[in-house]
């Protein structure tokens, strides 16, 4: 084998390695997102939030059907999504933008990892209410291809800012630092909603250690805490009603809550 052939072979191996590797996405931030906003914070102190790990729209029957996901989330004013499929060479639009177009919502897609320079997968927020600004923070350590992050969305209500946080974390047994970082961010905002898939139940010791003392689990009466890993956590807001939809369109249930702003959060 000549040196040229060896170099060619090594370049092929390197290219295959890079093509198959998932890379984390850097921290990002942005300004207002108002396109398709159909509600105003001036009209009401009550709004509905939801959280849904959509499993790339693959249901328990093995079929991928984004229309089923849209039907589940269509009544939410703000919905946080996890495991959202991004773009690729043969898939020019991510699932979040397709859902936003179907439901006529504001949308932000926060990819958590890239594959061959394409945003392969991530989290997203769809909203009827305008978003004032946003930022996304990667969290470490990550394991394998499961790169993680959380996003913070500031929304300007007539009673002050409301912050919506969305995340998808690995199990605390794989490292508590990501969970700690998310909870520290949550604790900074007096009026905030933390949504997402934590891969841990609310009675997990790590969750108990890092959850702010004044936070409430809006879903505590909806499904036994021993099973549920999807959360709607509140600070400075009150849940007037909560409900869920069973797994089927995804391998996760959908959870939602109707919230009222506390005019003077502590």
Language-model features and meaning:
Residues 94:
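Short, surface-exposed acidic-centric catalytic microdomains
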Residues 1-74, 78, 86, 90, ...:
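Active-site regions of metal-assisted phosphoester/phosphodiester hydrolases
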């Amino acid at each position: 084998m000549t040196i040229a052939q060896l170099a060619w072979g090594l370049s092929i191996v390197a290219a295959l390695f890079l093509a198959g590797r998932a890379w984390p996405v850097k921290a990002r931030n942005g300004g207002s997102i108002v396109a398709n906003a159909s509600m105003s914070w001036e009209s009401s102190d009550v709004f509905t939030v939801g959280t849904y790990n959509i499993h790339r729209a693959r249901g328990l029957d093995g079929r991928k059907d984004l229309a089923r996901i849209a039907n589940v989330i269509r009544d939410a004013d703000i919905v946080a999504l996890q495991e959202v499929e991004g773009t690729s060479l043969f898939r020019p639009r991510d699932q979040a933008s397709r859902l936003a177009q179907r439901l006529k919502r504001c949308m932000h897609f926060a990819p958590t990892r890239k594959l061959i320079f394409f945003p392969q997968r991530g989290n997203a927020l769809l909203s009827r209410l305008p978003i004032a600004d946003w930022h996304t923070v990667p969290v470490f350590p990550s394991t394998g291809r499961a790169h993680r992050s959380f996003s913070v969305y500031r929304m300007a209500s007539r009673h002050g800012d409301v912050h919506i946080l969305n995340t998808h974390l690995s199990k605390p047994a794989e490292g508590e630092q990501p969970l700690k970082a998310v909870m520290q961010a949550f604790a900074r905002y007096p009026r905030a909603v933390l949504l997402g898939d934590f891969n841990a139940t609310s009675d997990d010791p790590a969750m108990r250690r890092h959850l702010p003392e004044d936070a409430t689990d809006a879903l505590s009466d909806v499904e036994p805490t021993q099973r549920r890993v999807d959360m709607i956590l509140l600070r400075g807001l009150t849940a007037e009603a909560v409900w869920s939809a069973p797994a089927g369109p995804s391998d996760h249930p959908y959870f939602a809550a109707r919230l009222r702003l506390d005019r003077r959060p502590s």
